[in-house]
Swiss-Prot record:
NCBIfam families: PRK04208.1 (NF003252). Its cofactor is Mg(2+). This is Ribulose bisphosphate carboxylase large chain. The gene is cbbL. Binds 1 Mg(2+) ion per subunit. It comes from Solemya velum gill symbiont. Substrate binds at residues 115, 165, 169, 287, 319, 371. Keywords: Calvin cycle, Carbon dioxide fixation, Lyase, Magnesium, Metal-binding, Monooxygenase, Oxidoreductase. HAMAP family: RuBisCO_L_type1 (MF_01338). The record marks 326 as: Transition state stabilizer. Its EC number is 4.1.1.39. InterPro entries: RuBisCO, RuBisCo_large_chain_AS, RuBisCO_lsu_C, RuBisCO_lsu_C_sf, RuBisCO_lsu_fd_N, RuBisCO_lsu_N_sf, RuBisCO_lsuI. The active site is at residues 167, 286.
Amino acid sequence: MAKTYDAGVKEYRETYWMPEYTPLDTDILACFKVTPQPGVPREEVAAAVAAESSTGTWTTVWTDLLTDLDHYKGRAYAIEDVPGDDTCFYAFIAYPIDLFEEGSVVNVMTSLVGNVFGFKALRALRLEDIRFPIAYVMTCNGPPQGIQVERDLLNKYGRPLLGCTIKPKLGLSAKNYGRACYEGLRGGLDFTKDDENVNSQPFMRWRHRFDFVMEAIQKAEAETGERKGHYLNVTAPTSDEMMKRAEYAKEIGAPIIMHDYITGGWSANTQLAQWCQDNGMLLHIHRAMHAVLDRNPHHGIHFRVLTKILRLSGGDHLHSGTVVGKLEGDREATLGWIDIMRDSFNKEDRSRGIFFDQDWGSMPGVLPVASGGIHVWHMPALVNIFGDDSVLQFGGGTLGHPWGNAAGAAANRVAVEACVEARNNGRELEKEGKEILTTAAAHSPELKAAMETWKEIKFEFDTVDKLDVSHK
């Protein structure tokens, strides 16, 4: 019997609330934390989120009869309480894969975090997690090189990589900037880095910076016999200008470039990642602006979602927080998104904030980057938390050394190697860290001076965005 059109407004839950639905392996699944307006039933507001983020609108429309609405609509299929917070609840929604353009995280996010976030029936809405089916993962390019290829390119194995963000982040001339890079690389760092807001300002145009930095890299490589790199930030006002800067970095022999993937845009990032893969370049990703989206525990996008988006869009490094430094980061939640960056399969684990199984197939992993207010005293905890497949990035913790940049780099190199050796010998880094560092400092005056300089520096503030579940 043909369907008939009934004009008017009906409740969302009549069409989009389907607790009997069993998600398909090909569905994209989303978990939202929903804070409804007072008096709005949970089922109605969950269905409204499903409708407004897929095929629905505020009224019935006759053009629904021209398509197979049952095939394309999003389905709210489950509701759960949020532990310890009765003002909100979790809504689980399944989206047919055919709703989304292949390989386009932009298209996925435009639907899932689009107009629905301004819906009046909601007081707040947060996208907590997404499950991308393997059928969709395979349409995405992913990291340009991946962890193993990067280690092979650099010929560095068995320890975390060491980096340093050049400070002051703004105001240095290109020549002095290159000098700071050289001193850090010569002292023992693997990488130095542009800060996220270093682009092409009047005090240091991008081409001048690239040239002086490459001179620093080549000189440090010749003196140390090690492969070195600097994250040259190619973020630009337009994607054409971004690609121009990337091409020049390749031309002068740079092994790695950098992009601010949120402020620069996901379309630009995907384009750049594909170019890096084609041209044998590594891609470092900064997450500038993430806290605007992810820090409010009731509204926005959780960082684990932004992590998944980056892995699909493409990047070889991603800033991940430190747990122990100056920036926000719950330990278990951080471990959860580190797993999302690196592992080929993530099992649902609510104790780490992971709501769905996630199969990445053969897609390479991303190196987590610990950066923000860290110094040598944090090294045992960082090595224990992040393991070998990571980048430990000390800006002030290198350049603030009382003897200068090279000494700061040497102190960090001695500290990381001492911690790795101690771990490999079965010692407990976070319990025995002070003894491990003190023993190493007996043979390293640079490390001893660093330990004395930062012995009282701590960042003991409570985390704003905590996991909603108890750690098991």
